[in-house]
Amino acid sequence: MPIHLIAIDIDGTLLDSSYCLPEANRKAVVEAVRRGIEVALVTGRRFDFAKPIAAQLGCPLTMIVNNGALVKTADGVTRLRHLLDRETARFVLQSTPRFRNGTAVVFDRQRDNQVIYEHIDWEDPLRKGYL
């Protein structure tokens, strides 16, 4: 059975622990695309985080970002956008503050090129480098 799609997580899979793209991984992705296999980079992070990584690969890719809420091509064309509506987001934020201690709540306004976050503990090792 032929392979049609390879979906690759970025952090710790495509990139190494220093957030660098190993040459062997770059070559493998380029070879897969050359063979006609669609490659998708997948991350819970923002499109702006994934875009430079896609540029390093230098081949046409799909990017699944924002924990799957947004699917874009490497050049920024939106294929799918499924975000929380304003009312639901407001309800979640108002209902859960005691459960979100130290958790980042990010509002990503790409058209305005701004990121607004409620609180991020920058000393937490899981948060460093996230945005």
Please tell me what each predicted stretch does:
Residues 4, 18-35:
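Basic, amphipathic juxtamembrane/active-site segments
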Residues 4-18, 92:
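Asp-based phosphoryl-transfer active-site loop
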Residues 69-131:
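HAD-like small-molecule phosphatases
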Residues 29-52, 67, 105-107:
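Substrate-recognition element of Asp-dependent hydrolases with the DxDx(T/V) motif
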Residues 17-18, 50-52, 74-75, 115:
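Short glycine-/acidic-enriched loop or helix-start segments at secondary-structure transitions
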